[in-house]
Amino acid sequence: MEYLERRYLSASELQAVIDVELPNYWTGINRNAFVFCALTGLSHSDVAKLTHADIHTDGNGNRWIIDKRQKTGTQFRVKLLPIAEMIYDRYKDLHLVGNRVFPLKGTHKTLNMSLRHVARHAGLSFNPTIHLARHTFATTVTLTQGVPLETVSKMLGHKHITTTQIYAKITNDKIRQDMAALSEKLDSVFKVAQ
């Protein structure tokens, strides 16, 4: 099976999107939804339907999204990372219709148009889509940081790990890091006879 090459944001590109000052309130909301998706792996349809009831707090005070994928009905769970938690806290008291978390307007096409403005202000050389946030989660936020593919697959709500392999790219930097760690481990295991 041949996999399509998927795009994702690098860590520095994601940071530029997080940091950028935006002139428009709604563009800011759309940027925040994009960043939230990049840090949780949610798709547009999942973030659009996300309610406060989908956010659960465990015994240690950690907040988790526990829900079912809109597309497949597969359950997923993902912990809110600190920036995602800050974004959630920004909108939790808005009292939106249906107890929704984000005040998103329009379709994914409308959101993608807004993300073009975000990209321009953030200095990106391409126009990201909301779906690119999911690929960024799989690649930059999780796999590159050492999260196992099986765990990423469960957090994305994939039924088959082969689907996750399409989303996730192992970067050359990650290969270098892993090989350096392996070399260090093996140096104490194997010795060349003199």
Regions found by a protein language model. Name each.
Residues 26-27, 45-48, 57-60, 75-78, ...:
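Extended hydrophobic-aromatic, low-complexity segments
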Residues 8, 69-73, 156-181:
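Catalytic-site neighborhood detector that most strongly recognizes the C-terminal catalytic loop/helix
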Residues 35, 39, 45-46, 117, ...:
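C-terminal catalytic core of tyrosine-transesterase DNA break-rejoin enzymes
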Residues 2-4, 70-89, 97-117:
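C-terminal catalytic core of Y-nucleophile DNA break-rejoin enzymes
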Residues 182-194:
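C-terminal secondary-structure termini that scaffold catalytic or DNA-interacting sites
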Residues 1-44, 48, 145:
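Basic, Lys/Arg- and aromatic-enriched nucleic-acid-binding interface segment
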Residues 29-33, 105-108, 125-145:
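Short basic/aromatic active-site micro-motif
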Residues 13-18, 40, 49-89:
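Conserved tyrosine-mediated DNA breakage-rejoining catalytic core shared by Y-recombinases
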